[in-house]
Curated annotation (Swiss-Prot):
The active site is at residues 114, 250, 280. Residues 251-255 are annotated as: ACP-binding. It catalyses: malonyl-[ACP] + acetyl-CoA + H(+) = 3-oxobutanoyl-[ACP] + CO2 + CoA. This is Beta-ketoacyl-[acyl-carrier-protein] synthase III. It comes from Cereibacter sphaeroides (strain ATCC 17029 / ATH 2.4.9).
Length: 323
């Protein structure tokens, strides 16, 4: 028998404030048509004054726990994927642990920017397979609205805030590709491309900084690397693109999503899309899409999913899982 990390519950949280493209027209030189044409984004959510990343994460975590029928102390490990933690330290994960009232287990953050949730899933899978954890709560949460340069129309219109979470549980199975759970993971990074996507602040500058991006170069790397890592993960699982029920991509930009799907030879009607409603929520985008996809009735038990993401670093990767 094989131990698999199986999704037992999923949930998400979006801040109340919805910001349509029309609202951004009054802030920066842009138009609704310009934003839609270049990104597919129609609206996004922004966190309220005083609402932190850990607040969003805790709300998503509670939703996932409710979906799983579990209590906080049923969880062994809590992982938060984020680039916008409330403080330099302690971790957002320990803050969420406290907010949930968890009194056991351990918690830590994963920082791989937009690829963070994929990295966090891979870490959770390894912990479960090795026997170090039985149930892992994996959260992606971001407040990227606070990193925007509102004079840079190429980037400030793209991002939003939100959080999503999944509960993974170790379950015995025969270990075939037909069994539920995470089947394969594939992770990569290449620090030579740091200047393509970064925030120009931190401890070395004493500032929070703003997001900087070379959009055309990021697009080129994204399409190539995302399709490649997805195919590699599928090969590790002994599967191919024709076996995929749903691609659940990082919701960065509709152009990247559609170009990657085309490169993988997967039709767009088998791609979960939320970018139009959420914008780019970085590490939160995949768990948000998983939760929304399930709520819509698209993702069903037994479906084969491929999640893929790329972010600053550059860091990228994919996970193949049977829902």
């Amino acid at each position: 028998m094989t131990i698999r990390a199986v999704v037992r519950g999923v949930g998400h949280y979006l801040p109340d404030r919805v910001v349509p493209n029309s609202e951004l027209e009054a802030i920066v030189e842009t138009t609704d048509e310009w934003i839609r044409t270049r990104s597919g984004i129609e609206r996004r959510h922004f966190a309220a004054e005083g609402q932190t990343t850990s607040d969003l994460a805790a709300r998503a975590a509670r939703a996932a726990l409710d979906d799983a029928g579990l209590q906080p102390d049923d969880i062994d490990t809590l992982i938060v994927a984020t680039s916008t933690a409330d403080l330099t330290f302690p971790s957002a994960a320990t803050m969420v642990q406290a907010a949930l009232g968890m009194t056991r287990g351990f918690a830590f953050d994963v920082q791989a920017v937009c690829a963070g949730f994929v990295y966090a899933l891979a870490n959770a899978d390894a912990l479960i397979r090795s026997g170090q954890a039985q149930r892992v709560l994996v959260i992606g949460a971001e407040t990227f609205s606070r990193l925007m340069d509102w004079n840079d129309r190429a980037t400030c219109v793209l991002f939003g805030d939100g959080a999503g979470a999944v509960v993974l549980e170790g379950t015995e199975s025969a270990g075939t590709s037909a069994d539920r759970g995470i089947l394969a993971t594939d992770l990569h990074s290449d620090g030579r491309f740091k200047d393509l996507l970064y925030v120009d602040g931190g401890s070395s500058t004493g500032t929070t900084g703003h997001l900087r991006m070379q959009g055309r170069e990021v697009f080129r790397h994204a399409v190539e690397k995302l399709a490649e890592t997805a195919h590699t993960a599928l090969e590790k699982a002994g599967l191919g693109a024709g076996d995929v029920d749903w691609i659940v991509p990082h919701q960065a930009n509709l152009r990247i999503i559609s170009a990657t799907a085309q490169r993988m030879q997967v039709p767009m009607d088998r791609v979960i899309l939320t970018v139009q409603d959420h914008g780019n929520t970085s590490a939160a985008s995949i768990p948000l899409a998983l939760s929304v996809g399930k709520a819509r009735g698209q993702i069903k038990e037994g479906d084969l999913l491929v999640t893929e993401a790329i972010g600053g670093g550059l860091a990228w990767g994919s996970v193949v899982l049977r829902w």
